[in-house]
């Protein structure tokens, strides 16, 4: 987007020459080593395992193992959801199976963890969590080198501006705050995607469009699909800009139309290559509770307003949820990673270097686009008119738009690259009247931070005010902590932010008063740009003692030696899998609506209910049955919930069959086997099943509820037993005295196929959410095989796209050889 002839001074060390490129890599590695060094060398684990050591979570609380100090209460998903999912994927892959179906939650659901992600597949090479830090380093290298090549090829800046931006991009707040979450993985491909779009539209490389296909596929499969959609949305906006700039006034001519078609073809092939991931995910999402809520217009993260704007340059303005701090941001912000602070790219990059991009006229057209992209990324958080209604349109409202902030960060760094280029090769910097604008802004921010370090916010001015604030925001004053420690944290961080603002003011004054000549303080400026980000990043991600990594719980291990059955209670859903147990609850970001509806009918009144994870902490109604039993709602009997886990010490009148420190487990003797034959089958009109299931008189052994007519005797008799199973294949041996309905208490999903003695059979939705098959009298084998049509179609589409892509590459290769031949003849 800039003049490519500006690189003459830097070409001797940059580009593809190895010494220069190794310097790029070394800077990226050094930044990650500073942040995650203990985990990279194996002394720590890059997971917030201290969360597991909190009271009532997972690790037993005993006198020998007191409650650990909590680093941050927010990144619970890393240990509650994503690490159990990774371990399940590791288990399946190491047994030679691909992880399509997750039986450890909700009675079984499609496994939607981004299993095709190259980053997550690398994490699955070993069971050890030590791989997590190394994959984080690889991801940083991917996005950092992408930023380098984008700056060099698309922005046409020199080696050093591109290198500094490559060092900075993996350190920006979005990546740091979302470290470890699959949420951010698609964003690591953002520079490569923008570069592929730029090269395709400008037609500067024959492999650009095929490369766009590959990078589009990698973006779609690497992380969460909504963030991948936002990355592609940003690339679409950039494509329109590049197209408009490449074909000024000739947008309808043949060349312009061909260029646009090539971009669309590149994106289209990328979507087809990602079809095995996309199609099953979208199919499952249609059944999801959270999806239905978003379709209805319910917003989990509504816009904040202009009060969020200062966080872009003062990210710790409202504190954090980390230890010895408090998050006092205005409603509706609840934590730092979902706030505008995720756009932080460094106050020096934003207010010292980026404004210099406007110094030379040749940069200004491109700068207008980057300013627009930065505003677009902030639009949801700032509740900007015009943007927010657009982002609330169908399809777009399925995304969490507060996460568009990575576009703001990328745009600021693009402006920073232009600003650094101005300093290095743009000639002497002469005074401009507008230099005082960022200078005054930085001075104002500095003064405000110093003022706040003396006059603290009202919410933390006294212990009483702090307790009252915590009670309003979190409904609990017990976790508020000592206000003096919180005050010290705010004073320290306000002072640090003021110091960096002072550095920015000094930088502008230096440019105002400097003598004409070459800018000689570039190394110092580069140091401060990186240091600015490192001081924000350092210590944000918890790195914990390996001893905290899901230690064995004897009471839970003992369950595995007894009759199989699902569990409930004791700790957040999914953690049971780390002990080899399957929980009927779950949490997977989609949540199957029918299973959620059924489980909610069993919830005790004080049971915790999170709108985004309605069964995550669900505690069921029930009663203790001395000496060792427990009674549960009939629905849980139907769902094979055999073991109920409690914490602490049992009452004197109970003698649990399984007990260890802080854990005791009771057996629900009324739990049905996972496969059974109900005595009768009752047909109901659609919509009446939940009412019947919620009745205390419902007996799942006596009656099964269906919504379609079946021809069966008044009373069905037979015995069934599961003889063999893996997550995607279940074999049941049946001896039926009469025709009957074999019920499998697993979640119904359209991807399953049933075969009775090898003959395909229809699968009925039974009892609102589980599955059943009508079989004739006699002895036979019923097999359930998970073979979703969406996966089969996705594999065919991906194969077709791969063939087209390979053919395309072959044509490019042949044309390249044909073009070389005449040149060789002429040379000869």
Task: List the predicted regions and their residue ranges.
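Contiguous transmembrane helix-bundle modules in multi-pass membrane proteins
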Residues: 1-3, 8, 21, 164-166, ...
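Hydrophobic alpha-helical membrane-insertion signals
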Residues: 16-107, 282-289, 538-541, 545-550, ...
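Transmembrane-helix signature of membrane-embedded glycosylation machinery that interfaces
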Residues: 30, 147-156, 197, 201, ...
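Active-site lumenal/periplasmic loops and adjacent helix-entry segments of GT-C-fold
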Residues: 39-154, 160-189, 307-340, 754
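Periplasmic/ER-lumenal interhelical loops and adjacent helix-loop junctions
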Residues: 52-79, 83-87, 91, 97, ...
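Extracytoplasmic
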Residues: 54-55, 59-60, 293-302, 486-494, ...
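Selective detector of the "anchor" transmembrane alpha-helix that sits immediately C-terminal
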Residues: 127-155, 341-361, 497-511, 791-816
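Active-site-proximal, structured, solvent-exposed surfaces of multi-pass membrane proteins
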Residues: 574, 585, 642, 651-652, ...
